[in-house]
A protein has these predicted regions:
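Conserved, mostly hydrophobic/aromatic
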Residues: 1, 49, 58, 73, ...
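Short, solvent-exposed loop/turn segments at secondary-structure boundaries
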Residues: 61, 114-118
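Noncatalytic carbohydrate-binding groove/subsite architecture in carbohydrate-active enzymes
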Residues: 87-89, 118-122
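Extracytoplasmic/secreted proteins, especially bacterial periplasmic and envelope-associated proteins
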Residues: 41-44, 65-72, 122
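Residue-level detector of anion-binding/catalytic polar loops
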Residues: 55
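Carboxylate/His-rich catalytic cores and anion/metal-binding grooves
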Residues: 1-9, 60-81
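Aromatic- and acidic-residue-enriched carbohydrate-binding clefts of CAZyme catalytic domains
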Residues: 7-42, 47, 82-113
Length: 122
C-alpha cells in the first residue's frame, strides 16, 4: 500500500503527519482543494499496514520538495537511531524503524496537472 497516494503527495509535508495529533497542523491540500487535518499520518499508516499484512510503499514529494526532504524522510522511517529524524521517530513512540523497502518517487510528475510537473526533457 502506498502512502501518501496520488496527486496529494506533490504538496505533502511528511513532518506534518507525525507526532502528537493535537500538534499536527491542518493544511490546504492544493491537489484536491480540501483541508488536510493530518490526523491519520505516516505512523498510523505504518501501523495499519502491519495489521493488514501489507507492505508499505512510501511516496516522496517531488512536486514542491526534493532530495534533502527525501533523505530526512528515509532517516525518520528506516534508521535505527542516533540521528535527528530517527530519534524524533523514537520520541513519537516508535522505537524500531518502519523498515520501508519500497519507495515511490513522486506521482505522475510528467502530467501538467501535477504540482511541480516536469517534461521528459526537464
Amino acid at each position: 500500500m502506498r502512502y501518501p497516494g496520488g496527486n496529494f503527495v506533490s504538496g505533502f509535508h511528511w513532518e506534518d503527519s507525525v507526532g502528537p495529533k493535537a500538534l499536527r497542523p491542518a493544511r490546504t491540500d492544493l491537489a484536491w482543494r480540501v483541508i488536510e487535518t493530518n490526523q491519520f499520518g505516516l505512523n498510523e499508516f505504518a501501523d495499519w499496514s502491519k495489521k493488514a499484512g501489507s507492505e508499505m510503499m512510501m511516496a516522496v514529494n517531488l512536486g514542491t520538495r526534493g532530495p534533502e526532504d527525501a533523505k530526512n524522510l528515509l532517516e525518520y522511517c528506516n534508521f535505527e537511531g542516533g540521528t535527528y529524524y530517527s530519534d524524533l521517530r523514537k520520541s513519537h513512540g516508535y522505537a524500531k524503524p518502519h523498515d520501508i523497502k519500497l519507495w515511490c518517487l513522486g506521482n505522475e510528475m510528467d502530467g501538467p496537472w501535477q504540482m511541480g510537473h516536469k517534461t521528459a526533457y526537464e
